[in-house]
């Protein structure tokens, strides 16, 4: 009969072996989980509310505005932008950017240095005038609780002074990135005399849906007129005080004056206006499955390659540095040997906005057209400089 100590020693060794095995297993699980979290982690901000604002206020950007000076480089020498210049004249867009005194130099000026210069008219709305940007001073208080008040005052000012300068009027934040060429392409077959507005359509609260404020929303001229002359100060559904979520209150007000919340998706059902940075839409599983975003989308939200139209218009929560990254990727980076053909803007029909069939290459640049476009841009910028 073996001594008791023999069994005790054998049991201890077995227990030790099992403990080591369990420890290794747990360690591997934790390590794998950590790796997966790193893989799906994001460098960008994920908002915990559909009405979050100011999350990039403390993200530092370049000390000075950046600009490219490669107009005469080999890659741009043979670039043909006549279609974009044609649409610049045909589809006039006024962009107004919601900002505040603290963001003028940290965020707003980087908007002006990138996509803002492609607006027919560019206005920055703040509570304090700034002649360098420039920014207009609205008689409102700052803070997220006053965004609806600022929005109402901005549209009233635009209706009063800038109604005839544009056909479409887009509102966005100072951390929104817009591709104006794609916005004009989307709007070019639509009438500014129709009561409609477009953006990223959310579905709670407002019966017909409403557009995400951060992704930007664009009003036709008729919609702007109805908003100011029939809605604000006239309808119960147009909230009189400064409270409420800006985009929700805008949706309620526009619905009350029979402005339709339009569908901005492309013919494949992919969205054009995006409430987050590209990474959050393109990479699956970055956004938590229990996040508000999934239940707020009017149309089923898609992840990965099906998330975004090839002619995407906007992205939100874009920090200053990323403004320049997107500017480079959209307007400067080119795959050598690949050229694009464009569908005739006269023949495009609604709902098939980027067919490859019946495509045509644009005509070559004309110096007179180029000078006309530069004049339009200069007038818009000059107008902005003298409004504050």
Curated annotation (Swiss-Prot):
Optimum temperature is 37 degrees Celsius. Active in a wide temperature range from 4-50 degrees Celsius. Activity is not affected by storage at temperatures ranging from -80 to 37 degrees Celsius for 24 h. Residues 43-65, 344-388 are annotated as: Disordered. It is an enzyme of class 2 (transferase). The keyword Cell membrane does not apply. Disulfide bonds join 95-119, 238-253, 307-308. Its main location: membrane. Its EC number is 2.4.1.122. Residues 347-368 have a biased composition (Basic and acidic residues). It catalyses: an N-acetyl-alpha-D-galactosaminyl derivative + UDP-alpha-D-galactose = a beta-D-galactosyl-(1->3)-N-acetyl-alpha-D-galactosaminyl derivative + UDP + H(+). GO terms for biological process: core 1 O-glycan biosynthetic process; protein glycosylation. Coiled coil: none annotated. It comes from the Eukaryota. UDP binds at residues 98, 100, 142-144, 150, 173, 316-317. It is a single-pass type II membrane protein. It holds the Pfam family Fringe. Optimum pH is 6.5. Glycans are attached at residues 80, 376. Signal peptide: none annotated. Keywords: Disulfide bond, Glycoprotein, Glycosyltransferase, Manganese, Membrane, Metal-binding, Nucleotide-binding, Signal-anchor, Transferase, Transmembrane, Transmembrane helix. Belongs to the glycosyltransferase 31 family. Beta3-Gal-T subfamily. This is Glycoprotein-N-acetylgalactosamine 3-beta-galactosyltransferase 1. It comes from Biomphalaria glabrata. The lineage of its organism: Eukaryota, Metazoa, Spiralia, Lophotrochozoa, Mollusca.
């Amino acid at each position: 009969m073996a001594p008791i100590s023999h069994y005790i020693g054998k049991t201890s060794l077995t227990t030790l072996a099992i403990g080591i095995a369990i420890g290794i297993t747990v360690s591997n699980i934790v390590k794998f989980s950590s790796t997966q979290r790193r893989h799906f982690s994001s460098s960008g901000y994920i908002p915990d509310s559909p009405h979050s604002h100011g999350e990039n206020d403390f993200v530092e950007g370049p000390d000075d505005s950046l600009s490219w000076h490669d107009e005469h480089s080999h890659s741009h020498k043979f670039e043909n932008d006549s279609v974009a210049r044609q649409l610049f004249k045909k589809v006039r867009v006024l962009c107004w950017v919601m900002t505040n005194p603290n963001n003028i130099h940290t965020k707003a000026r980087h908007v002006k240095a990138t996509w803002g210069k492609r607006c027919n008219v560019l206005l920055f709305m703040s509570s304090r005038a700034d002649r360098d940007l420039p920014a207009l001073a609205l008689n409102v208080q700052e803070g997220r609780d006053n965004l609806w008040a600022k929005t109402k005052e901005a549209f009233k000012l635009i209706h009063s002074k800038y109604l005839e300068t544009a056909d479409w009027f887009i509102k966005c934040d100072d951390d929104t990135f817009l591709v104006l060429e794609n916005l004009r392409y989307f709007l070019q077959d639509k009438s500014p005399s129709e009561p409609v507005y477009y953006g990223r359509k959310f579905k709670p609260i407002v019966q017909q849906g409403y557009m995400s404020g951060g992704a930007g929303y664009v009003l036709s001229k008729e919609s702007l007129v109805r908003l100011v002359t029939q809605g604000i100060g006239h309808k119960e559904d147009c909230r009189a005080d400064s409270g409420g979520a800006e985009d929700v209150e805008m949706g309620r007000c526009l619905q009350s004056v029979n402005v339709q919340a339009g569908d901005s998706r492309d013919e494949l059902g992919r969205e054009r206006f995006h409430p987050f940075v590209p990474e959050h839409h393109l990479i699956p599983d970055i956004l938590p499955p229990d996040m508000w975003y999934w239940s707020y989308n009017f149309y089923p939200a898609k992840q990965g390659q099906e998330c975004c139209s090839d002619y995407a218009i906007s992205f939100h929560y874009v920090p200053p540095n990323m403004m320049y990254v997107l500017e480079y990727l959209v307007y400067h980076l080119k795959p050598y040997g690949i050229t694009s053909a464009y569908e005739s803007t006269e023949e495009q029909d609604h709902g098939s906005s980027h067919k490859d069939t019946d495509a045509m290459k644009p005509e070559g640049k004309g110096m007179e057209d180029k000078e006309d476009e530069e004049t339009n841009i200069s007038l818009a910028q000059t107008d902005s400089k003298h409004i504050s």
